[in-house]
A protein has these predicted regions:
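Active-site core of metal-dependent hydrolases
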Residues: 2-128
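Short, Lys/Arg- and Gly-enriched loop/turn segments at beta-strand edges
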Residues: 215-221
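His/Asp/Glu-enriched, well-ordered alpha-helical/loop segment
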Residues: 77-92, 96, 108-120, 126-204, ...
Length: 230
């Protein structure tokens, strides 16, 4: 009811939840009926839990491989579910830290690009000098570009620039940019039901980032108006 009330005030596009928790499947059904997309994340769900949630309307996996049940030969968990299922879309942090280079290659080899959504999960301290920082009141430390919680040492988010993630995947997989670029905007827009976004074509919002051959940002356009030039 709380989410329904919030959705009536301002449209909710996506909710991340642990599908193994009591009431989660019923929540997914009601949220989906209200036009809210549901994603599994921060979860210890089994493959059976995943299947129940997907039948109820689950469409995403949140920052794939991170904070979710791992792949095991007797229980494939959410990581295995993401590889096995051909419909579920997965969010992926392409920094070779949250997923190592070999895992990135494995995922992009076994999943269709149409089901991939590159994200950064970046912090406010992204691309700042190494040192202390903050994550919602939790102290973090950034060392060699890797952000970790000071207390536990767990990854606290990334310091990834979006274009660098695209560059990393392109060079690791050899996949053409014309294919990979779908995972940077088009897939996300389609999954969230955002019309007129994610493609350079007549009738679409002219929000564009131009990159050079080394993936450095050259120009940024918002609504067709140049807002940045290197």
């Amino acid at each position: 009811d709380e989410v329904a009330n919030l959705n009536s005030i301002a449209k909710v596009l996506l909710v991340s939840l642990a599908p193994e928790m009591p009431g989660a499947v019923e929540f997914i059904e009601k949220a989906t009926a209200s036009g809210i997309r549901c994603s599994a994340g921060h979860s210890a769900a089994t493959h059976a839990d995943f299947n129940k949630a997907k039948s109820a309307g689950l469409v995403h996996l949140t920052h794939y491989c991170n904070q979710m049940s791992p792949l095991h030969h007797r229980e494939i968990g959410l990581v295995g579910s993401g590889l096995l299922d051909r419909e579920i879309k997965i969010e992926i942090i392409c920094d070779t830290i949250h997923l190592c280079a070999d895992m990135l290659k494995t995922v992009f080899k076994n999943k269709e690009t149409d089901q991939m959504m590159m994200i950064t999960d970046s912090l406010a301290c992204s691309w700042m000098p190494d040192g202390p920082g903050d994550l919602g009141g939790l102290p973090i430390i950034v060392k060699d570009g890797v952000a970790r919680l000071q207390e536990s040492g767990a990854l606290a988010g990334s310091t990834l620039k979006y274009a660098h993630g695209l560059k990393t995947v392109h060079r690791l997989t050899g996949k053409p940019l014309s294919d990979l670029v779908k995972s940077t905007s088009w897939n996300q827009a389609q999954s969230l039901g955002l019309e007129g976004l994610g493609k350079i074509a007549p009738g679409f919002t002219a929000d564009m980032v131009l990159l050079d051959d080394d993936f450095n940002t050259c120009k940024v356009f918002i609504d067709g108006v140049e807002k940045y030039s290197a």
